[in-house]
C-alpha cells in the first residue's frame, strides 16, 4: 500500500476564462476537486493502479465536502477531523495565464496533531511507501515532517518527502532521513549556498556528495523545469530529458512526478525506469486540464520519448 499525506488540503476551484476583466463581472463555471499536493499524488496513483490511501486533516463544511469529493473520485481516505475549516484555493486560467489565490488554512490544536500522529503511525505500519507533500498548517512546528518520517522509516516504509523551506531543512538535519527528496534548482542552491545553473551538474553532484545532510538520502532529485531533472541514487547520477508536449495545465505536475516515483519505487523498478516513470507522469499531467490527472492514452508515446542518461 502507498500512503499519501496532505496536512493542509484544500477544496480547489478552477475557473477557465478567455479573458479576466479586472474591476468588472466575470461569469464562470467552477470545477471543484479535492486539492492539496498529496491528494494530487493519490489521484495519479489511482490511475496507475496502485493501492493507495490518503490521509491528513479535514474540518468544517469544506472538509465534509472534500471527503465527498474524494469518495466520488474513488480515493480511499482516512483523515483526522479538526475543528477548523478546510481551506479553499482558487485557480484562474485566463488568456494563457494562470493566477492562484490560496487561503492559509486552519490552525491545528495540539490534541488534533496528537490524534493525527496516532493515525499516521497506524497507517504507516501497513505501507510500503509514504509520500509527504506540501506545506504544514499553522500550529504545527517545522520539524513535524522529520518526526513522522522517522515513524514511517522505522516501520519499514520508504518516505518520499516533497516540501521546502524550514520543513525540508529540518528533515535534512534529522537522524532518520527520507528515501527521496525533490527540491528544484532554486531550492537546492539555497540549501547549498550555491548558484548552480542547469549546466553545472558535475558541480552539483560534488556539492551534494560533500554535504552530510544529503549523505544518507538514497534518492536526491533536482527538478530543472524545461531542462528536465537530475537524479542521484546511491552514488549514481542521471539526467532525465523530457519531450516537448502541448501543455494545458502544469499545476500538479510536480505532484504527479512524485506519484511516478512512488509507483516505480514501490514496484522495485531499476533506476532508469524510476526516472522515466516519474518524468512521464509529470508530463502527462501537464497535458490534462484536470490537476493531478494523467492523459493515459499518451503514456507509451511520452514514456518512450523520455531520455535518461547516466552521467
Spans of features found by a protein language model:
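Glycine-rich phosphate/adenosyl-contacting loop at the front of the ribokinase-like
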Residues: 1-55, 62-65, 311
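Gly/Ala-rich phosphate-binding loop of Rossmann-like dinucleotide-binding domains
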Residues: 46, 149, 153, 266
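Conserved phosphate-binding/catalytic region of the ribokinase-like
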Residues: 201-311
Amino acid at each position: 500500500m502507498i500512503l499519501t499525506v496532505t496536512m493542509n488540503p484544500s477544496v480547489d476551484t478552477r475557473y477557465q476564462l478567455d479573458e479576466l476583466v479586472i474591476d468588472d463581472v466575470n461569469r464562470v463555471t467552477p470545477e471543484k476537486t479535492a486539492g492539496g499536493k498529496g491528494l494530487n499524488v493519490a489521484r495519479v496513483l489511482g490511475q496507475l493502479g496502485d493501492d493507495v490511501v490518503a490521509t491528513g486533516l479535514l474540518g468544517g463544511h469544506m472538509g465534509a465536502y472534500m471527503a465527498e469529493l474524494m469518495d466520488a473520485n474513488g480515493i480511499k481516505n482516512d483523515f483526522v477531523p479538526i475543528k477548523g475549516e478546510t481551506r479553499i484555493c482558487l485557480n484562474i486560467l485566463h488568456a494563457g495565464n494562470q493566477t492562484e489565490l490560496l487561503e492559509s488554512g486552519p490552525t491545528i490544536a495540539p490534541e488534533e496533531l496528537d490524534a493525527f500522529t496516532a493515525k499516521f503511525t497506524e497507517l504507516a505500519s501497513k505501507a510500503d511507501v509514504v509520500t509527504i507533500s506540501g506545506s504544514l498548517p499553522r500550529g504545527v512546528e517545522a520539524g513535524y515532517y522529520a518526526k513522522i518520517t522517522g515513524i514511517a522509516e522505522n516501520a519499514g516504509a520508504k518516505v518520499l518527502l516533497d516540501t521546502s523551506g524550514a520543513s525540508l531543512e529540518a528533515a535534512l538535519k534529522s537522524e532518520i532521513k527520507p528515501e527521496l527528496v525533490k527540491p528544484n534548482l532554486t531550492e537546492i542552491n539555497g540549501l547549498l549556498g550555491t548558484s548552480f545553473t542547469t549546466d553545472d551538474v558535475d558541480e552539483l553532484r560534488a556539492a551534494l556528495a560533500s554535504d552530510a545532510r544529503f549523505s544518507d538520502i538514497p534518492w536526491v532529485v533536482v527538478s530543472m523545469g524545461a531542462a528536465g531533472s537530475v537524479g542521484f541514487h546511491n552514488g549514481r547520477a542521471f539526467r532525465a530529458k523530457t519531450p516537448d508536449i502541448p501543455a494545458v495545465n502544469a499545476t500538479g505536475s510536480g505532484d504527479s512526478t512524485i506519484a511516478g516515483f512512488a509507483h516505480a519505487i514501490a514496484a522495485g523498478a531499476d533506476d532508469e525506469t524510476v526516472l522515466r516513470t516519474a518524468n512521464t507522469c509529470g508530463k502527462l499531467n501537464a497535458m490534462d486540464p484536470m490537476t493531478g490527472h494523467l492523459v493515459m492514452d499518451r503514456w507509451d508515446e511520452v514514456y518512450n520519448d523520455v531520455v535518461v542518461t547516466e552521467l
